[in-house]
Structure formats: structure tokens, C-alpha cells
């Protein structure tokens, strides 16, 4: 297939460009808050992938819309189907993923519900099949080392009867709890995308099958589909008051940082009246009873201009509407020429609409906004989001780190010191920070935590048991961005506690004892002169790391020795400092 002949070349260029953009953003004095997330579909990748990458300064997470849940009738098990591969056979999935990762984005692909009516609800009702769904999702995350998963299971809302919701809801909650535990054990993110809910105590509850309050402790993101408000009749896509109402409910039951409001990159276009007889091939869709058509926001102005319509911004709904007439010419079912004129009404959001909704992110300190689909918007819409994001940009921090020494022997302390300031060098007092250690095998862990003093400085003595790369981290808050210091390497060597005699008689054997730290059995201990001549026989440590070397009788002299501790799977060879014994 040659569906995307230029996509591979485009990706190659973007792989180079994305890191440059990150550098420019890092150097900006006030980079915008990354409040935008959104979906990247499996289709039209040549259009939508560049749109995502060109706005990397705004986008912290991207949800590739690449997977769907199916039920395999032969194996009687759920499976996750990869729709990206089918649509893009000539472009390996690793290519767009590399471009997104180079742009610094968290990648949380979406899985949709591609099963038939009540199939998923029945799968979640049984512990065995519910676990099969969990396992299939976890395996999908592992397949490309994704940062997590986003679930867009709309079948409950729009395919299953609402009479089943009370039965489905508790099984859904169990599923989310089990999936969340499985993902969090691997430090992965669980994102849930659902239609709106309102307070269940109110008359209008929304899609309560998704049980936000019950799943809140187990999820990391809630992306609300604050669009498709109007369906059968002309009206706004997602009126601002309705959007704010569901957002207010969400933040009342979970941390606001988990909540993302939806932004539609599309509009809808309804037929309100038809005059004349429409062509036979259009008769079922050019009628007031037909489903509304859709169009991309970026095409709205040209549609209005083509038909002489004058768009009007509705302040109440914070959306744009326009009406127009369009003629359709063709033939009837009997082959006669015919023309009909349809009156149509369109609604869509624009740059001003996006700005108003981005301001809700600021008002409620939300995690951000989620756009369907990034790249469908008019150019000024992204400008509007960027303006709001810049106005609420978190303060940028700088962290420094120094070590009292870059090498210590086991059991001795090292002092970490430094300062955390704003970019203008103003100190940040009473700020919590953590010290992260990264080990040679690639594993990391938090070694200790602390708080800056009144002048933004810190000083922490630490006992560290093995060689490690250290850095100081601060977490992001609404007021401040996350920060990390440069990483510094600390080498930790074995320690050797020696008990040599200060003097011995010549011609008489003597012993030298000691302890190797950290304590370990079977470590080879060798005594030699500083010229390298081995004295006596090598020995090994006992279970407490202790050893004794029996030294043969020596002639009268001032002897200088050195003990070598052999290597093992964890520690390299280590030699003690030279020491002298008077042989009288």
C-alpha cells in the first residue's frame, strides 16, 4: 500500500526537529504550562503527527488512538487489536513513537471498546474474564513500553441499555481497581475517558455507569468528553455552563490534578428544513430526521464563506453558530432530474471557545484539557491555548548539587549540599525535595527527602552503601514546575578495618587481623609488600567479614605491607593503604 508514501521521510525530519524545539522551550524565560493533551488517530498520520509535534511546548501527554478491545469467538477470550498497523502497513509503529518520545511526551495510548452490545459488561462481571481483560491491557502497555493506558469504553453509555448501568457499575469499579493495581505495580498510568457525570444526588445524573467517585482512588487521569451535548437537534457542541458543571462535580470527588476537560476539534451541521425533492442517493441523509454531519473546526470558516453565511459567536454557550442554504441536484429513483434546497445550521468551537475552556483549567487548577483531535483546530485556537497556558505558567526552578567527595569507603558519610532557586536566583524556602539514586543496573530509588532552609539551601549527610549517580528532585505543583539537579556520580569502595601489630619479634610468626565492610563471607584476602611480593598464604573472610592472615617469621626490618581484597560479583578489587610494622 502507498497510503502514506511520504510519512517515513516526514518522521525522519521530525525526529531531528523535536529535540531542537525542546531546547528552545527550555531556554524560554516563561515557557507555557503544559495544559494540553489529546488524541492522535491511526488515520491521516501525515496531518496529525506534525500537528502534535509542532505544539510540544503545550502538550505533556498524547493518547495515540491505536487500539480496540475485541472478543475472539474462537478462543472465547478478549484481545487487543492494533488498528495502527492495519492503517499504516509501511510505517512501523516505532517511528511515530520515537518522534513523540524525542519531543518529551508521555505516551498513553487509548483502547476503545470494539465489542458488541453487553459483551464487555459481561466480561467484567466474571472474575476470570475480567482478569483476562486486565492481562490483555497490561500486555499492550508492555509491548511498546508505554507510560500507561487510556480507556475509552463508550459501549456502556451508547450501546448497552441504560437499564443495565446499575448492574454494570460495580463490576466496572472492580475492573478499574484491579487494572489500576496491576499498572501501578509497574509504575504505569491509568487514564479513563468517559462522557459527563453530574452529582448523583441531583435529578440529572449523566452517565453514572462510570462511577467516578468509586474509581477515583484507582485512576490517575479522568478525561471528560465535554462535547456531543447536542445530537438530534441543532445546538452547541459543549456549552460552557454544562462543561463547568461536570468539571465542578469531578473536582469535588477527586484531586483536580486528575481531571481533564474535553475540547472538540470538530463541529456539527444539522438539516433543519428541506424544500423540493432531494436526489435518491441523498434522500435519507438530507432530511431533518437524519444524523448531523460533522466538519473540522479548521474548515468552518471556509464552509460559511462558501455559502454566504455569517458566523456568530454565542456568549452564553461560548461557541460559534451559522445557518445557510445548500442545493443538491441529482436524479430521483425513477431517473428524473431533481433539486432540493436544505436549510442547515452549524455549531462549532473556535479560538475564543478554546480560550474560555482553557481558563477553566486555570480556575479549577485542572490537570489540563484533552482535545479530539489535535490538528483539527483552526490555527488561532492553538494560539489562544498558548496565551492562557503562558499566563498561568508555573515558576521555573533551578537546583544545584555538590558532594563533599566523589569517592568514599563503605560506612563513611558523604554530604550533599546545594540550593534551589527561581531562575532569577531568588531562594525558595521550605521546599520539599528528594534525593534520587540511579544504580549501574539502571534501577532508581529515592534515598532520602528533605526541605530547603530559609535561604533555599540544603545540606544532608548520608551513608550510601554502593556506587550511585545522585540528583536532587522537586515535584511539580500548580505554582512551580518540577526541577532536577545535574547528576553527580559517587564511587563507594569497600572498607577495610585492620588490626596489625605495631611491632613484632624477628624470627617469630605473627598474625594480622581485620574486617571487610560490607561484611561478606569468602572474600579473598592477600598480604603483599609494596613491591608486590606476596607474603604467606591468601585467606578468606568468615561470615562476619573477619579474617586473619598468618605471616611467616620475618627478618629484622621496618616492613611495609598492603592488603588486597579480592573482587566478587558486586565489588571490584580493593587495596588498603600501605602500613608498616617494626620487626625488631
Please describe what each predicted stretch is:
Residues 62, 151, 222, 261, ...:
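Conserved, mostly hydrophobic/aromatic
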Residues 265-359, 388-392:
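Glycan-binding loop/region signatures in secreted carbohydrate-active enzymes
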Residues 456-460, 545-549:
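Short strand-edge motifs at loop-to-beta-strand transitions and within beta-strands
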Residues 284, 391-424, 489-519:
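Beta-strand-rich domain onsets/edges
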Residues 422-445, 518-534:
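Short flexible loop/turn segments that cap and initiate beta-strands
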Residues 74-91, 157-303:
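Substrate-binding surface in catalytic domains of secreted glycosidases
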Residues 464-485, 557-575:
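Enriched for extracellular/lumenal, surface-exposed ectodomains of secreted and cell-surface proteins
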Residues 29-139:
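Glycan-recognition patch characteristic of GH18 chitinases/ENGases
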